[in-house]
Swiss-Prot record:
Entry protein name: Holliday junction branch migration complex subunit RuvB
Function: The RuvA-RuvB-RuvC complex processes Holliday junction (HJ) DNA during genetic recombination and DNA repair, while the RuvA-RuvB complex plays an important role in the rescue of blocked DNA replication forks via replication fork reversal (RFR). RuvA specifically binds to HJ cruciform DNA, conferring on it an open structure. The RuvB hexamer acts as an ATP-dependent pump, pulling dsDNA into and through the RuvAB complex. RuvB forms 2 homohexamers on either side of HJ DNA bound by 1 or 2 RuvA tetramers; 4 subunits per hexamer contact DNA at a time.
Gene: ruvB
Keyword Transmembrane helix tagged: no
Protein location: Cytoplasm
Species: Allorhizobium ampelinum (strain ATCC BAA-846 / DSM 112012 / S4) (Agrobacterium vitis (strain S4))
One annotated GO biological process: DNA repair
Assembly: Homohexamer. Forms an RuvA(8)-RuvB(12)-Holliday junction (HJ) complex. HJ DNA is sandwiched between 2 RuvA tetramers; dsDNA enters through RuvA and exits via RuvB. An RuvB hexamer assembles on each DNA strand where it exits the tetramer. Each RuvB hexamer is contacted by two RuvA subunits (via domain III) on 2 adjacent RuvB subunits; this complex drives branch migration. In the full resolvosome a probable DNA-RuvA(4)-RuvB(12)-RuvC(2) complex forms which resolves the HJ.
Length: 347
């Protein structure tokens, strides 16, 4: 289990499922401008032709709106939306049950599609390409192959780790969409909208303070907003100001860059124990007593985006930004060493 601060994990939690705060249309959705513009065109074209939308693959860190976009797509297409995740589909029969219940042009959303088992993935290939199920009924000499026709549907899938998808599966998605971290300005709009829907007073600098510490992730911004609201209500404040937001987030151990204790431990360990790196991911995982996947999927994407670390062939290396944030002096030969590592990376 990860020791990351629960309010900063981008993974989905029960309190995050608040349909009232979710945008309902692509026009309401903030951020990801290029992806939204393209999706609008693809949806309009599919509706004009009366066809199912081509299969869509969302790629990006958790908490950026992949599930929300899938729901919006179904709504704008005027079709049913069904949702599941890779780990839930344990057997080929589970997938067959889902697919045979879909109606014409329905949207099926599979989160964490990289966690599908190979046996289930094999069933998915003909379903995506030919809208047919190829099932083996029975065992041994009595086994026979049965083909079942499916309604033409749209598979919308999401993954945080594109490299774990097999090439045959990846190639069957006609519309790949990569989502990126949000800017502070975009998150500020999301925080203001959330506060308005909650009936919560919010000053401009209060919204900006929350947005600044939300790690570029709307899900985290929403969670921080709910926690700051708790502090504001108990203090009987008429509105969330920068001072209230700062006090609340500091008490929640979220620093001014959105880092928590685990993030700081990560950076400090590389700085103090390994002289700023390079250090391998397995060594970092052992030192933090955290699973490698949690470090690669949750901690590092934001670190890289903010310029705190570099990934090199020899391991992770702290940048000058990280040393400054920690308040530590980097090694004198750091710049020369990083230049050599960059050259190796280019090779």
């Amino acid at each position: 289990m990860s020791a990351q601060n629960p309010v900063l994990t981008p993974e989905k939690r029960g309190e995050d499922v608040d349909s009232a705060l979710r945008p309902q249309t692509l026009d309401d959705f903030t951020g990801q401008a290029e992806a939204r513009a393209n999706l609008k065109i693809f949806i309009e074209a599919a509706k004009n032709r009366g066809e199912a939308l081509d299969h869509v693959l969302f790629v990006g860190p958790p908490g950026l709106g992949k599930t929300t976009l899938a729901q919006i797509m179904a709504k704008e297409l005027g079709v049913n939306f069904r949702s599941t995740s890779g780990p839930v589909i344990a057997k080929a029969g589970d997938l067959a049950a889902l697919l045979t219940n879909l109606e014409e042009r329905d949207v099926l959303f599979i989160d964490e599609i990289h966690r599908l088992s190979p046996a289930v993935e094999e069933i998915l290939y003909p379903a995506m390409e030919d809208f047919q199920l190829d099932l083996i009924i029975g065992e041994g000499p009595a086994a026979r192959s049965v083909k079942i026709d499916l309604s033409k549907f749209t598979l919308v899938a999401a993954t945080t780790r594109l490299g774990l998808l097999t090439t045959p599966l990846r190639d069957r998605f006609g519309i790949p969409v990569r989502l990126s971290f949000y800017t502070v300005e975009e998150l500020e709009l999301i925080v203001r909208r959330g506060a308005r829907l909650m009936g919560l007073g919010m000053t401009d600098d209060g919204a900006r303070e929350i947005a600044r510490r939300a790690r570029g992730t709307p899900r985290i911004a929403g969670r921080l907003l709910r926690r700051v609201r708790d502090f504001a209500e108990v203090a009987r404040a008429p509105a969330v100001t920068r001072e209230i937001a700062d006090e609340a987030l500091t008490r929640l151990l979220v620093d001014n860059m959105g880092l928590d204790q685990l993030d700081t431990r990560y950076l400090t360990m590389i700085a103090v124990n390994f002289g700023g790196g390079p250090v391998g991911i397995e060594t970092i995982a052992a030192g933090l007593s955290e699973p490698r996947d949690a470090i690669e999927d949750i901690i590092e994407p934001y670190m890289i985006q903010q310029g705190f670390i570099q990934r090199t062939p020899r391991g992770r290396v702290l940048t000058a930004i990280a040393w400054k944030h920690l308040g530590l002096m980097p090694p004198k030969d750091m710049e020369a060493a990083q230049f050599r590592l960059t050259l190796e990376d280019d090779d």
